[in-house]
Amino acid sequence: MAIRIKLKPGREKSLERRHPWVFSNGIHNVKGKPEPGQTVDVVAHDGHWLGRGAWSGESQIQVRVWTFDREEEIDREFFKRRILRAQAGRDDLIREQGLTGYRLIAAESDGLPGITIDKYANVLVCQLLSMGADVWRDTIVDVLAELYPDCAIYERSDVDSRKKEGLASTMGLLHGTLPEMPLIIEENGIKIAVDVTKGHKTGFYLDQRDNRAIAARFVKGKSVLNCFCYTGTFGLYAAKAGAASIENVDVSSLALDTARLNMRVNGLSDDNVHYNEADVFKLLRQYRDEGKTFDVIVLDPPKFADNKSQLNGACRGYKDINMIALQLLNPGGVLLTFSCSGLMPADLFQKIVADAALDAKREIQFIERLSQASDHPIGSAFPEGFYLKGLVARVW
């Protein structure tokens, strides 16, 4: 008989709406002694069946639900079905945008909690961030090797969130032979160098793909300041779109070296591109003091809030950096500003930028609201999957 997790009265409502998390404070009792990652059934207080998921006793999220179908078993075929469904849901996008790099599995939003898989050319990069994902590692790799026989499989589970599951950080080759780094992927006719062993996240920010293309609409003949540029891909799109000048700013010299490489592999001259290894906050203040201005500024900072206790500080950080950026823009200029903090509500982010405009004594108009690329879907019952928020503002 399956191990059974009974919820407290009233705590079944989120699962009935198909939210996949069961928190420790919502559990009434546990029938049996589940092992870490073991499949368990979740029932309401009155005993009716709700879902089947993976147990993680050390985590605040003690069950992540794999399925809400009572007849569905969690086995090799389950993972194969989920991966095939996810691939089918992306095939049109891949053809439309000529993608050789994309997110194949977006964790909970693709029905595989704690599992992220990105495909970069002939390498699949996995992040296994939950106990259930970790326990099923060999099965997941076996299925991927069957479905993508020409791909190496590499793990990038080198993230702090695994500690919350009682898991150690880990990375390394899981299957096949890893090609020489960097790989070259393509999107929208643009080539991008990616190192899956050393790059941020799984190697690259695939989620900003659509926003890079949107930014390119505003840059022809303009001066562009690309802040927190990483490997310079907003600047790369800008160069291809005919920007007059581009300044790529990042604290990492390695990232800037890759930005230079990206220009070369696309056959673009970087005579009008400046690469600046600098702290963005300090540099923006310096430019303000010097009276320097730009036509277009991209602000794509790292996550400012990892938990709710950091949200107030994150709000101050976002307001400060947006205020200074607004002061650097020429009248009629454009600010593209982002938050990748999942805890930051979109409406609050817009309010922060509006308040920053007041402090900067600039009038702005929001002309577009941006989000993550469509290979990063948001499950209808999983609003936490909506993490990337962006705004395009015209500045006067």
From Swiss-Prot:
It is an enzyme of class 2 (transferase). It catalyses: cytidine(1962) in 23S rRNA + S-adenosyl-L-methionine = 5-methylcytidine(1962) in 23S rRNA + S-adenosyl-L-homocysteine + H(+). It comes from Shewanella oneidensis (strain ATCC 700550 / JCM 31522 / CIP 106686 / LMG 19005 / NCIMB 14063 / MR-1). Keywords: Cytoplasm, Methyltransferase, RNA-binding, rRNA processing, S-adenosyl-L-methionine, Transferase. The lineage of its organism: Bacteria, Pseudomonadati, Pseudomonadota, Gammaproteobacteria, Alteromonadales. This is Ribosomal RNA large subunit methyltransferase I. One of its GO terms (molecular function) is RNA binding. It is found in: Cytoplasm. Its EC number is 2.1.1.191. Belongs to the methyltransferase superfamily. RlmI family. Specifically methylates the cytosine at position 1962 (m5C1962) of 23S rRNA.
